[in-house]
Structures are given as C-alpha cells and as structure tokens.
C-alpha cells in the first residue's frame, strides 16, 4: 500500500504533484507549506468549489468529473507512462515503504506503552482495540478524534465521518440511519463525550429500541471539549488559557455515567477505565448487539493532555 496516513502536512513540502480529489480543504495553508514548484490538480464534480465565496487553494489543472469515473481513466493513462519510469517508481516505492515502516514502529511503540500500563488510555488505544474486533464489512461511523491510522478500512462504505460543514451531534443519528439502511451489517458508532451529549442520547436510544436498530456506541470520554482545547492552544499556545489549570467552557467534569443512559432503553452499558479491560468490554458489547439484538454503549475513559492538544493543533 502507498497510503501514507491522514496528515498531509509532512509530505507537501517535497511533493512535486498533488492530486486533490473531491476535497474542499485539502490542507491548512497557515500550517502546511507547499513545494513552490508543485503542480496542483483538483478533481471533482466541482473541482474549484465555485459556490464558496472565498477559497484560496491553487489549481494548475482542474478536472471536472465524477471521481468514481475519472480515477480509473487516470490510472489507465498513467499506466502507459509508467512503462518508461520503472526505476523512479521503484525508488519512490522503496522510500515510502521506509516511511511507512517508521510510522508503524512509532505507532506500535505507543500501543505497547499503553498495553504495559506505562501510558494512559487514549484515542489510539481505542482505535487499536476496535480494529482487533471489527470485521472488514462492519460499518464504522465516527464523530470523534479516532486515530484512523490504527483502523484497517478495506471495504467501500465501511466508514462514515462528519462532513466539513460539521453538525455537532451528527454521529448517533447517522449510525442509526446506517443501521436502518443496512440491517445485516454490524454498525459501530464512535463519539466523543461532548458529541454524545449533542446527539441527544435519550431520544437516540429510544429510537434504537423502538425500531430494532442495535448499534454499538463507543464513547471516548476525556471529560472535555477536546476540539475546543485543541483550537484554543493552537491559536494561543502561550495565552492565558494555556496556563490555566482548568480553562472555562472546556471541561465536562464531573462526567455523567453515560453508559447508564442506554439502560433506560433496555440497552447494554459498560464503563472502562483500565486499558486492559477494553478488548473484553468490546466483545461483550458485540455480543449484546449480535446475539441479544440490543444496543450497547461502552463508556471509555481516555486522556487528552495539553501536549497532545498542542501537537494536534499544528498537524
């Protein structure tokens, strides 16, 4: 695989060609700098997003068309040129393999620390454990900062995330919509604790029970508005909020026992505070959904310290 992860900033400065596919914000200009000689190709039904009042991304070549139709045509055209560029392609593939190996080693080191108890449970661990129990044709709906680099997504339609326009609380309803449309599929819904509250969990779980839509919801509960903390530290890394022990309008503490809300609608709820307990908890949630045909909520206590928030803010 040539997939390099979900953070483009590391590779943009040395890229000589950038193909943007149906993406209105492919990078953050204030954070990510392009190679000045790079050629930017934008592909999509509206490659320039002409209905946006302001959009300042460069475009050396705009290709208007459906990505599903255009990409196979582009692949066919590139295959002809590849015949004369074998050595360059092999060198590039070897370089990328090395980078991916370094990424995998760093990620595994992080997972090993959590597994050994020398690091606290975070989003990467949740993703790692989910990846151990999910099947390729399961559907994952995420309104969270889930570490997608730890999730193997191999099947089309197996992942749904929030749109660029946002919509706080989207995740719970979207997951039930996916289950309603694909009843034979197992559906995971991963949300932050703030997104869970925005999703109106009481009516969401009522609808799940009333319409027989057993979804397994995983709450990554860091007891805060993580996006607010990240954005604040990104804009004002040395500001008053960064030196505050508990910045206002950020923390959701004391945290409710979210896993008990689902029990009011005859669902299965469980709380996880120890990383070692998460795999078994997920299996119990899957049993509730698959065997008992009940919805389930796993309330996972995670950490998100200021160092992680600052690092995320500049990716």
Model-identified regions with their sequence ranges:
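Redox-cofactor binding/interface segments in oxidoreductases and associated redox assembly factors
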Residues: 19-20, 42, 142, 189, ...
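Generic structural signal for well-ordered, non-membrane alpha-helical segments
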Residues: 8-12, 63-67, 71, 85-92, ...
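Structural signal for hydrophobic packing residues in well-ordered secondary-structure cores
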Residues: 16-22, 48, 71-82, 100, ...
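Short glycine-enriched loops at secondary-structure junctions
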Residues: 46, 142-148, 221-225
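Glycine-rich, acidic loop regions that bind phosphate or pyrophosphate groups
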Residues: 1-96, 282-286
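Short glycine-/small-residue-rich Rossmann-like dinucleotide-binding loops
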Residues: 23, 145, 302
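Active-site diphosphate/adenylate-binding microenvironment
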Residues: 97-184
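Thiamine diphosphate
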Residues: 2-3, 12-15, 55-56, 64, ...
